[in-house]
Amino acid sequence: MPMQGAQRKLLGSLNSTPTATSNLGLAANHTGAPCLEVSIPDGLFLSLGLVSLVENVLVVAAIAKNRNLHSSMYCFICCLALSDLLVSGSNMLETAVILLLEAGALATRTSAVQRLHNTIDVLTCSSMLCSLCFLGAIAVDRYISIFYALRYHSIVTLPRTQRVIAAIWVASVLSSTLFITYYDHAAVLLCLVVFFLAMLVLMAVLYVHMLARACQHAHGIIRLHKRQSPAHQGFGLRGAATLTILLGIFFLCWGPFFLHLTLVVFCPQHLTCSCIFKNFKVFLTLIICNTIIDPLIYAFRSQELRRTLKEVLLCSW
């Protein structure tokens, strides 16, 4: 089966451009004008997916092993790692299937291949939606822990957390099934873009509010101890830098993919847009990179989780 015919419906079929032969080159659009096209080698794509897979498996194993990590916050982090694991795993699986089909090593009927790709499509789309949802859930959890600290354990109970997690998984699977079924409708793509923007705005508002509260708290401590104001300014700058990195990574890794979907709706035949479409695999690679970065931001900063992770690694040896 050719490369174009094997690409996924919702995600891959949006980019009908064949894989480039050079790592970085100028491809011509319909008028012959040069387009910047970055080709991601399959080996690099699979390697990044493997790193993400191993990293997130370790996070899930560490949280499952340590009962002290069975709190609501770590449940969300564990589900984020699991969804990131599925994002990288499903993309690796589809890439491997395509390579095997092109090499003739996997000979099967067209109907069976189509069913396989439909299954992978649903898995990929639902895991992406779950990943975005759990990033938002972690932001909400941290917001409640700061602004409702005394009532946190009565608001964010483990049964409620489990119901939220179940609702996210079920809603993501059902939504992705509908998206894959009606992938050729512009409303489907716009719904995905609006969902991404909603998560971005939610995270930005919550984290900015948390930063403002932290700065107020630091300022109060400084006034109590009658220290100089530069310390407060330094804290504010560090907090702003951390917030910029957190939201910046989220936007840079996910934004290009949803920009691609937006352009598919509004300018599918435009020459400039067609140049952007040629870099679809780059956008998927950025999402894989985000699944590698997520554990570094949300999981590995925990001393308890790092200690448990060392135990898991020692046991594996």
Curated annotation (Swiss-Prot):
Entries under SUPFAM superfamilies matching the protein: Family A G protein-coupled receptor-like
Bilayer topology: Multi-pass membrane protein
InterPro entries from the UniProt entry: GPCR_Rhodpsn, GPCR_Rhodpsn_7TM, Melcrt_ACTH_rcpt, MSH_rcpt
Sites of S-palmitoyl cysteine lipidation: C315
Keywords: Cell membrane, G-protein coupled receptor, Glycoprotein, Lipoprotein, Membrane, Palmitate, Receptor, Transducer, Transmembrane, Transmembrane helix
Subcellular location: Cell membrane
Glycosylation sites: N29
Family to which this protein belongs: Belongs to the G-protein coupled receptor 1 family.
Protein name as it appears in the record: Melanocyte-stimulating hormone receptor
